[in-house]
From Swiss-Prot:
InterPro entries: AAE_transporter (IPR050144), RCK_C (IPR006037), RCK_C_sf (IPR036721), Transpt_YidE_put (IPR023018), YidE_YbjL (IPR006512). Keywords: Cell membrane, Membrane, Repeat, Transmembrane, Transmembrane helix, Transport. It comes from the Bacteria. HAMAP family: YidE. This is Putative transport protein CKO_00031. One of its GO terms (molecular function) is monoatomic cation transmembrane transporter activity. Its main location: membrane. The keyword Cell inner membrane does not apply. The keyword Repeat applies. NCBIfam families: PRK03818.1, YidE_YbjL_dupl. It is a multi-pass membrane protein. One of its GO terms (cellular component) is plasma membrane.
């Protein structure tokens, strides 16, 4: 059997063994995709014992390409909502998550100086303790750029594997510890979260207002500044018993009921100007109007602003909301449409059908993958990651690398959405498949390279001390920030658990947090809010640590 055939066969065996290990769960918690790392260690041990020779060039390519696939698909997935997560609504959560990353870096630096831990080893411990695989890849690349011998670079994978198990267990123990210390009632926390959302902290809400301001009588909607802004959408108007879709030229009269959509603060401002909020229903049931959601799939409308499509004037249809990558937005007239956007339409059935034809609404297109944008994005990401940034006093130029470059490019392209007929939307199933394939390939190679010396290091070398260092790097930031967030910020427990899981980019921890309450989405929401920024910081941190330690050492 040739080297290439043997290498592919061994990698397939690693994936099978590793995924089987990852599916083993204790009380609903397992290693998940991280099991591939331990499958690689097990198989790598026996490959080394048998004296098999694998293709080192092929292993290197597979490791790097797997990492690129993984970080690129993550960026495409979270890109549309990344910049929205940095708004004020998620600012507090992101600040606490950033604090966890900073404290983890400081603990790593202190351990490195006190115990003189070799640079590759301490970076591997850091990456494993925070359960972040792209950090491992970024650290290995910067070490190679610094001229570190390959044998030492491979040590990083071994120390990563030593610290990884407690990295997963540590976050779960922290959640349990917070629950015990503060005697948390999970049901009460879930109810508090729901009450917070209903009291105006969700992004988009609706309000029915009766026109009582005499100054607005017989004015056109377009002449009322609060109604002609991009912050408020008036999607329905009820006069006596007649429900209609208002256009910019619609004349409003005293006593009219307006159904407005917008953010809570903007709705409150509109209510102060227009009149009194009422409980009267403006439902389309029993009328000739209906509400329907359609999806943007027509390439001809991609990148066009809503105002330029003239849906109100041509079809008497209002877009009341726009959902982009799971984030509800006000459908402002300046918003540009992207592939996969979901539009909430209000109008007559025939008019809605006409608008649906204009925007596409072809569900089958959502399952198709454009491969050209994928490789354009990967190529641009690799180029971005290769651009050197020279910092005075640093021994080498900083680079985003093969982990950071594709991630940043994917975030940007995911936010842009489309350029001409190229769109970077990727069906969730396809995104997940490429992401899982990438991380399996990367971890399989890391495990194989670490497996030969893993047992000896654990039983006869420094393996146990590495595990101890990892426990400090995992536990100190999580417990410190967990206490601060709960005591001083009065953070909801379920939200706190999601934020802690997101700060470690740890899906098994998110699964555990979600299982704390069957119906609450608090943990998933906070996890998604901090995940994109934390992933970026986790990739950059080991590079900064490596350059600083190298310069100081």
């Amino acid at each position: 059997m040739s080297d290439i055939a043997l290498t592919v066969s061994v990698l397939a065996l690693v994936a099978v063994v590793g995924l089987w290990i990852g599916n083993i769960k204790v009380r609903g918690v397992g290693f998940g995709i991280g099991g591939v790392l331990f499958g690689g260690i097990i198989v790598g041990h026996f490959v080394d014992q048998a004296g098999m020779t694998l293709s080192s060039d092929m292993l290197h390519f597979i490791q790097e390409f797997g990492l690129i696939l993984f970080v690129y698909t993550i960026g495409i997935q979270v890109g549309p909502g990344f910049f929205a997560s940095l708004r004020v609504s998620g600012l507090r959560l992101n600040l606490f998550a950033i604090l966890i990353v900073i404290i983890g870096g400081l603990v790593t630096a202190i351990l490195h100086k006190i115990f003189a831990i070799p640079l590759p080893v301490v970076l591997g411990i850091f990456s494993g303790a925070v359960t972040n695989t792209p950090a491992l890849g970024a650290g290995q690349q910067i070490l190679r750029d610094l001229g570190t011998p390959m044998e030492a670079v491979d040590q990083m994978g071994m120390s990563y594997a030593m610290a990884y198990p407690f990295g997963i267990c540590g976050i779960l123990l922290t959640m349990w510890l917070m629950r015990m210390i503060f005697r948390v009632n999970v049901e009460a926390e879930a109810k508090q979260h729901e009450d917070t959302l209903s009291n105006g902290h969700s992004l988009i809400q609706t309000m029915n207002i009766r026109v009582e301001n005499p100054n607005l009588n017989n004015m056109a909607i377009q002449d009322v500044p609060i109604l002609n802004s991009d912050k408020i959408i008036c999607s329905r108007l009820k006069r006596d018993e007649t429900l209609m879709v208002p256009s910019p030229g619609t004349i409003i009269q005293s006593g009219d009921l307006l159904h407005l959509v917008g953010q809570p603060v903007d709705l409150h401002n509109a209510q102060l100007v227009i009149g009194q909020e009422v409980d009267t229903s403006l439902s389309t049931r029993g009328t000739d109007l209906r509400v329907e959601r359609v999806v943007v799939t027509n390439e001809k409308v991609l990148g066009k602003r809503i105002r330029d499509l003239h849906f109100k004037e041509r079809y008497d249809v209002v877009i009341s909301r726009l959902n982009r990558a799971g984030v509800e937005l006000v459908a402002s007239s300046d918003a540009s449409l992207q592939f996969g956007d979901i539009l909430n339409l209000v109008g007559r059935p025939s008019s809605i059908d006409a608008v649906a034809n204009v925007v596409g609404n072809a569900q089958q297109k959502l399952q198709q993958v454009q491969m050209l944008p994928v490789f354009i994005g990967i190529g641009l990401g690799v180029l971005l990651g290769s651009i050197p940034l020279f910092v005075p006093g640093f021994p080498v130029a900083l680079k985003l690398g093969l982990a950071g470059g594709p991630l940043i490019m994917a975030l940007i392209l995911g936010r842009i959405g489309s350029i001409g007929k190229l769109y970077w939307f990727m069906p969730p199933s396809a995104n997940l498949a490429l992401r899982e394939l990438g991380i399996v390939l990367f971890l399989a190679v890391v495990g194989l390279k670490s497996g030969g010396d893993f047992i000896d290091t654990l039983t006869q070398g420094d393996g146990l001390s590495w595990i101890g260092y990892g426990i400090f790097i995992t536990a100190i930031p999580l417990i410190t920030v967990g206490l601060l967030a709960r005591i001083f910020a009065k953070m909801n427990y379920l939200t706190l658990c999601g934020m802690l899981a997101g700060s470690m980019t740890d899906p098994p921890a998110l699964a555990f947090a979600n299982n704390l309450h069957a119906t609450s989405g608090a943990a998933a929401l906070s996890y998604a809010t901090v995940y994109p920024l934390v992933m970026f910081l986790r990739i950059i941190t080991p590079q900064l640590l490596a350059v600083l330690f190298w310069g100081l050492g």
